[in-house]
Amino acid sequence: VEKNLQVRPLCPQPQILRCSWEEESELPTLRELGFEEPARDERAVLDFQGGEKEGWKWMNEWTWERGRLEKYKETRNGLVGADYSSKLSPWLSGGCISAVQVYWEIKRYEEERVANESTYWLFFELLWREFFRFVGRRYGPRLFAKGGIKGEETYPGDPHRDKLERWRLGQTEDEFVNANMVELVLTGWMSNRGRQNVASYLIHDLGQNWLDGARFFERNLIDYDPCSNYGNWAY
């Protein structure tokens, strides 16, 4: 697929945005809206800040300043620290930056620095992300069904609320699973390898319904995206 793929060029950035209002104002804080400011855990892999500027700032730092793109394939399955993966998914899921922008940034890096398996692999991950969008568009609500898009309940699960709750709280018999679940709850983030392991544990070791896991991820992930989340769980 990727050999014949044609990615559209970037749209030119508008020079002037005319607004229907004249007076400047500020967005209310969470406290002003009646919510508590979330406490940042110092163990978080990255201090994620929302918005387009922050997304571009991190992409530039990770790609160009730290030079991590050209090592991505070697480090992508890491668990700890900011460098092992791009961590662009929160900004992608929030619409702060687009997959097309990331693609052209990869191409620019390949032209100006180096093109290797790692630069290709980040592009491949973007294709994987797009694949789940095509699946969602093709199958619609079946993506969220217990039997998945095939309607096959391969692992029907044995509902056991205690097992599910211990998984959610990071209080299982597996310390690796526990560490990843605690990270998710406290920071809203979990590595890709961590996600694969805790999902496998919930389904194959605890015998629980995959949808319960997908819904818990939906409530807690800062990079939650319906197609990627449910697509990866079903996969």
What function would you assign to each model-found segment?
Residues 84-235:
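Active-site-proximal binding-pocket segments
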Residues 1-151:
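Glycine/tryptophan-enriched, flexible segments
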